[in-house]
Amino acid sequence: QTCCGYRMCVPC
């Protein structure tokens, strides 16, 4: 998983 956006930890 990768943290991207605003505190959004999702498979980017």
UniProtKB/Swiss-Prot annotation:
One MF annotation (Gene Ontology) recorded for this entry: toxin activity
Keywords on record: Amidation, Disulfide bond, Hydroxylation, Neurotoxin, Oxidation, Pyrrolidone carboxylic acid, Secreted, Toxin
Disulfide bonds: 3-12, 4-9
Domain of life of the source: Eukaryota
Compartments where located: Secreted
Residues with Pyrrolidone carboxylic acid modification: 1
4-hydroxyproline: modified positions: 11
Entry function: Chi-conotoxins inhibit the neuronal noradrenaline transporter (NET/SLC6A2).
Membrane listed as a keyword: no
Family: Belongs to the conotoxin T superfamily.
Source organism per UniProt: Conus textile
Post-translational modification summary for this protein: Contains 2 disulfide bonds.
Residues bearing the modification Cysteine amide: 12
Residues bearing the modification Methionine sulfoxide: 8
Tissue and organ expression note: Expressed by the venom duct.
GO cellular component: extracellular region
Domain notes from UniProt: The cysteine framework is X (CC-CX[hydroxyPro]C).
Name this polypeptide is given: Chi-conotoxin-like 2
